[in-house]
A protein has these predicted regions:
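Acidic surface patches and DE-rich sequence motifs
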Residues: 13
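Structured beta-strand/loop patches that form or line metal/cofactor-binding pockets in enzymes
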Residues: 1-10
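Intrinsically disordered, low-complexity linkers and terminal tails enriched in Pro/Gly
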Residues: 1, 30-33, 110-116
């Protein structure tokens, strides 16, 4: 049995707001830490039957980047759920929700840009 290690470094400002996020993992093959503007980590606590989460984003992450991040995360969550369950009908629903979410975001951005 082998052990993989994931390391996450979060630098915060004086108000404890993330200024930078860097991560590394033993199995990636990358020589140096990778920069990220956001992260979502979830752990399942079987005893409590609850998800434990760490959601962080840096102060310089733009709203459009956040929408892209959420869209891609929702799509990959659907793929993961599909691989685990083979419940393709629910996978399709999750992906449709993600597409609708992203479409509504784009429409909102267009409206807000017109108003300016």
């Amino acid at each position: 049995m082998s052990i993989s290690t994931i390391t996450i470094d979060v630098q915060t400002d004086e108000k404890k707001i993330p200024a930078s996020i860097h991560w590394s993992a033993t199995d990636t093959g990358a020589d140096k830490k990778q920069a990220a503007k956001a992260m979502m980590i979830s752990f399942w606590d079987a005893a409590e039957k609850a998800a434990l989460r760490i959601d962080l984003w840096t102060q310089d992450m733009m709203v459009d980047e956040m929408a892209d991040f959420f869209y891609q995360t929702l799509m990959t969550m659907a793929d993961t759920y599909g691989r685990a369950t083979q419940y393709n009908d629910q996978v399709d629903e999750m992906k449709q929700f993600a597409r609708n979410f992203y479409t509504r975001f784009r429409e909102r951005q267009l409206q807000e840009n017109k108003a300016q």
